[in-house]
Amino acid sequence: MRIVFMGTPEFAVPALQVLVNYSAIEVVGVVTQPDRPVGRKRLLTPTPVKEEAIKHGIPVLQPEKLRRPESVEELRELQPDLIVTAAYGQILPKSVLAIPRLGCINIHASLLPRYRGGAPIHHAVMNGDTSTGVTIMYMAEGLDTGDMISSVELAIGDSDTTGTMFNKLSAAGAQLLLDTLPDLLAGSIQAVAQNHEAAVYSPNVSREQERIDWSRPAVSLWNQVRGLNPRPGAYTTWNGEVLKIWSCDKPNQSDVANTPGTVVAISEQGILVATGAG
């Protein structure tokens, strides 16, 4: 089977590795985002998926906009039977969805229909969820609206952050793909439609969501800090300076009654700050 893989960040690399190592599959092309300037020196840097594709000698396409006719034609010339995507970063237009005879599938880092959109891991942790997961689904024209093929659930522990869950869900998605491929190749998939009325969306994190509002409950702020670690980071201000908060202890019941945002104590263990509740 001829497969085109579409993905960009580290999250997608294990899934590409599964496809490369699967004997019944030929990865005929990889589509990823264009190289971007990174770091203080703004060095033009390839995506992790591009680097992995180069290791295996796989042709790489990096269209600025996938919907352009020349980009669609490049994909069509690869003659894929199936397109597999994972955190690619662009919505596939109808002209691309129509190319492979077996359709397009996506590895999405949530248990759909919860957390459709671009930041499902951030929102799961920020909202204090105790579990999340990965769903493999057929792709449709809507945002993460396609029929579901398979899924797996993972726990979110107290020590987890978006960063740790990113790694866990990346590995789980690759394993789920490996487990799903035999039925996919055999044509025996029984996909299930999503309950669209239960859909919850997870747009990219805004600057306002990064700001710590000390009047909120302590548990809510604890989840915010975990959910924004390692990127983009929760922040507050002190004497006009922006301070990033990367970690904090899980709050317990406190009888301290201070104005939210007040520094209550400073010790070797850290800084104790009053919040709206605890």
Predicted feature residues:
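Residue-level detector of anion-binding/catalytic polar loops
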Residues: 59, 131, 242
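Structural motif corresponding to alpha-helix initiation and N-cap regions
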Residues: 13, 43-46, 68-72, 118
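N-terminal beta-loop-helix "entrance" segment that forms/cooperates
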Residues: 36-56
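Internal alpha/beta domain cores that form substrate/cofactor-binding pockets in large enzymes
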Residues: 2-4, 27-31, 55-78, 83-85, ...
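Acyl-group handling in specialized metabolite and lipid biosynthesis
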Residues: 203-216
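N-terminal Rossmann-like dinucleotide-binding module
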Residues: 1-41
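An anion-binding loop in the catalytic cleft
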Residues: 21, 32, 215-278
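Donor/substrate-binding cores of folate-linked one-carbon enzymes
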Residues: 82-201
